[in-house]
Amino acid sequence: MRRITRITTVGIASAALALSATACGKSSSEAGSSSTSDSKAVKAAIAYDIGGRGDQSFNDAAYAGLQKAEKELGVKGAEAEPSEGESDADKVQRLTALARSGNNPVIGVGFAYAPAIEKVAKAYPKTTFGIIDDTSKTGPNIANLVFNEEQGSYLAGVAAAKTSKSHTVGFIGGVEVPLIKKFEAGFVQGVKDTDPKAKVLTQYLTQPPDFNGFSKPDLGKAAAQGQLDKGADVIYSAAGLAGSGAIEATAKAGKWAIGVDSDQYMQKGLAAYKDHILTSVTKDVQGSVFNLIKSVKDGKPQSGEVRMGLASNGVGLAASNPAYTKMTDVIAAVEKAKKDIVDGKITVKTTP
């Protein structure tokens, strides 16, 4: 059963009680009668990024890691959802409540948690804090879980260029921030290295401090339609929940979409469009969350930069669509590019 702890601007004490009462797998009434042994169980928590659980992408990948830890490690999990338009102070309050409730580790899903984690980690030095997609804030009890997104995106560019009939492809970024620029840079380089004459249409949905580009599917849908109208027949979106709108528009037009973060061909919420999801650039967010939880449980908590790239299968390109697996020339080109990146023959740019 899905149990989400929602913390917005409630007081710290009441928030902590709410978290304790809604740990994954327990109703509030069950939690109220917890035994002493329950209170000593290892607990772990994740605080979701914009879009929350159900985004069919980034947040859901993190949740899958927590689920795996619950099943394989016997960990008691807790979750906390973001609120629209929240401040860093709201994030501090959420993370504080999670730490005060005894969760260890506490994981912030997304770079937006960096300032809050830096502050709360100092207040709870015995708790390990994980942050995904950020290295700007460090500390002895902070694990920076990061990925070479540009490498996976390069492979997507190769696949897009090899698949396109119009020699025009599209990239849609949710919000124009350095992280998403990495996706763009790798994708464009992969396209151009494969087909120098190809045209890459690039659009960002919003600019900071407006982060709706990660959460509004209608924005992604409109952007994709604009690129389709300009002749794009393969569109890659790095836009969280907003990317689902781009996938919908692309699929309805009978063109190819490329997903991100999770294998979006396999996501139930996108089942109606999966035949047009050529592939997805995957990040092993699930594995990074699970590994951090396991390290804490084993008494050897990770800290510092924990980077995952093509060489460690931390990023990659999904091959779930049977139509894609039949494209032997595309797969051969992707595999060659992967080998060349791992061997150091290709250096992928991190900025456009």
Predicted regions located by residue number:
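N-terminal export and membrane-targeting signals
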Residues: M1-S14
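C-terminal motif of bacterial Sec signal peptides marking the signal peptidase cleavage site
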Residues: L19-A23
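Intrinsically disordered, low-complexity segments
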Residues: I12, A18, A31-S37
